[in-house]
Every structure is written in structure tokens, then in C-alpha cells.
Amino acid sequence: MAHAELATEQMLLKEIGRTERNRRQIRGWLAAVLFALFALVLVGGATRLTESGLSITEWKPVHGVIPPLSAEEWEEEFRLYQRIPQYEQINKGMTVDEFKTIFWWEWAHRLLARGIGVIFALPLFFFWVTGRIERRLRLPLLGILALGGFQGFIGWWMVSSGLAERTAVSQYRLATHLTIACLIFAACMWIYRGLCPHSDDAHPTKRSQGMAGAIAIMSLFQIYLGAIVAGLDAGLSYNTWPLMDGAIVPGGLFVQQPAWINLFENPKTVQFVHRLGAYLLFALALWHMIASLRAAPETTHARRSVLLFALVTVQAAIGITTLLLQVPIGWGVLHQGGALVVLGFAIAHWRGFVGTYPRDTAIEMRD
């Protein structure tokens, strides 16, 4: 009897060790995906700020990997760009060499997006067929893969909005594109954090988990609002802080009819709402930190709340600086990257309240 119990215990320990090894491999893979997604969002921000997003006027998911390689091919690509309103109304007289500059930004963005698809799909297939992915994670990971494929379509849908009548992409489609990218990033972070070891600290308060979730959701919504700001160049409508043209609430916020359309199409209103969102996020993070420190100052959850508030504060400072400097490219990209850092940490903090995924003892290893 004792021998059987010992054998069972040894088998269990072996299974636990195998599970931990598998989880380390999955975490390493997801960390690489998260890093690549972060880089993609930064390149996407630079592509937008340099007004390069419409330089490639065709969607070629496979052949588009290869850029123009000869003078004739560059001339043909440039001729395609010369047909769209952005060239006619903004960049008339641009040379081929100047066109190459904006082309490379958009090409790099698309190439990196394709690369992330490979980085995600191939390891997913390998980990799946070798039994390294726990059953509870299979459907979520497939969902992320499907959302990533859909994001490619959304990207072209966004670009196509600026090829016929507009000189820039639709702010609605830009916001959709960026928000889906951030959803993919958040989902990967949620799973990654769930595979990491967690502390056994008690929650600082019963409301702490809900507050952490509210901060994460508000961070994502603020990114959506920021994308609307970017799509309308609303960051240039008021370049003063804390007042807007000398007022807390500027005039002309609801001049368009119906009134609700101002929230999406009036640059002044859009910037005002984005500012309000930033103040709300700052207040939520501050409240969460104070409540956590008062309830349980020595816990990991409380320490994370301090770091989260610090990140929100730094991001607010970057946003204000970007505004005052009238949105230079470097600061604009930094602000977009900072938003993703805040979102990622907010998601990890929220997931920390849930704890590690329970071990799936039914994992099957196959050579």
C-alpha cells in the first residue's frame, strides 16, 4: 500500500514538473508575442503621425511582402499613390524619393503585422500538437488567432476609407483598428499573467478586484478615445493646459447637429472628452491605490496599485507634454506606447487578483 502511494506521489510530482516546464515555454512564447505587438503599435503610431498610412493603395496579403525592387516598380507604386485624394490635395509635387519615405513606414507596419501572425500561429500549432497547451487555454488562444486574422481585414478596411474621397482614414475605423490591437494585447497579457506564479496575499479589500478591472477597462476606453483624437487631429485644436483656450469648458463643443455627433466628429469636443477620460482614469488609480494601502499596505496587491498609479501619472505627464508641444512625432509615439504600458500593467494587476490557472493534470505529452 505504501509503495503504491509513493508511486502515485512520484507520478503526481512528475506531472506537476512537466506542467511547470510547459508553462514556462508558453510564457516565453507569449512574452515574445507581447513584445512584437508592442512594437507593432509603436510602428503603427509612427505610420499615422508621418501620414504614411495611405502610401500603399492595394491589399496584397501574400505578394505585398516584397517591396518595389526596381526603378520601374517604384514608379508604378508611386503612380498608384498619385491617384488618391491625399496626393492631389496635400502631397502634390512629391518626388519618388519622398514617396519612398512614407512607403517604408506603411510597408514595415504591414510586414510586422504579418510577422506577428507567424510568431503566434506556428508556435501555437507546435504547442498544441505536442500537448503542451492546457485544455482551458485552447479556445482562448484560438480566439486570439482568429481576432488577429480579422484585424488584418480591419486594417485594410481602415486604409480603404482614405483612398476615394478623404485625405485621411476614417477616425471610426482608425479607433476600431487600434482598439482591436489593444484587445489582442490585453488577451495575451491576461493569459500570460495567469500562467505566472502568484503571491498568496489576501486581497486588500473586497472591492479591490472590481476596481482593478474598472481601471483596466477605462484604460482601453481611453485608448479608443485617443484614437478618435488622432483620427481628427484633435490634439491640435487646443494646445494649452490645464485650461482650453482660457476656459475649463470651452465653447463650441456642441455646434454640430445632432448633438451626439460632436463626440466623434468635432475636434474640440473629442479632445475635451479625452481630457475628461484622463482625469477619470487618474482619479480611479489614485482611489484604488489609497484604498489598497489603507486596507493592507504590506501586500503585493497594494504595491502593484502604487506602481499602477505611478504609470498612469507618467502617462498623463507625457500626454500633457505632447499636447503642449503640438504633437511632435516622437512624443506622439511615446504617448501611444505609454498607453499600451498602462493597459498591459492594468490587465496584469487585475489578473493578479484571480490567481494562477489551476494545474491541468490531464495534459498529454506526445513525441
Curated annotation (Swiss-Prot):
Positions annotated to bind heme: 274, 335
Coiled coil: none
Membrane topology: Multi-pass membrane protein
Superkingdom field: Bacteria
Chief site of localization: membrane
Biological processes per GO annotation: heme A biosynthetic process
An example molecular function term from Gene Ontology annotations: oxidoreductase activity, acting on NAD(P)H, heme protein as acceptor
Known EC number: 1.17.99.9
Entry keyword Iron: yes
Keyword terms of this UniProt record: Cell membrane, Heme biosynthesis, Iron, Membrane, Metal-binding, Oxidoreductase, Transmembrane, Transmembrane helix
Intracellular or extracellular location(s): Cell membrane
Cofactor annotation: heme b
Record-level GO cellular component terms: plasma membrane
Transmembrane segments: 26-46, 111-131, 139-159, 174-194, 212-232, 276-296, 305-325, 327-347
Enzyme class: oxidoreductase
Reactions that this protein is recorded to catalyse: Fe(II)-heme o + 2 A + H2O = Fe(II)-heme a + 2 AH2
A Pfam family matched in the record: COX15-CtaA
Alphabetized PANTHER family for the sequence: CYTOCHROME C OXIDASE ASSEMBLY PROTEIN COX15, CYTOCHROME C OXIDASE ASSEMBLY PROTEIN COX15 HOMOLOG
Subunit structure as annotated in this protein's UniProt entry: Interacts with CtaB.
Family (UniProt): Belongs to the COX15/CtaA family. Type 2 subfamily.
Role this protein plays: Catalyzes the conversion of heme O to heme A by two successive hydroxylations of the methyl group at C8. The first hydroxylation forms heme I, the second hydroxylation results in an unstable dihydroxymethyl group, which spontaneously dehydrates, resulting in the formyl group of heme A.
Descriptive protein name: Heme A synthase
Organism: Rhizobium meliloti (strain 1021) (Ensifer meliloti)
Lineage of the species this protein comes from: Bacteria, Pseudomonadati, Pseudomonadota, Alphaproteobacteria, Hyphomicrobiales
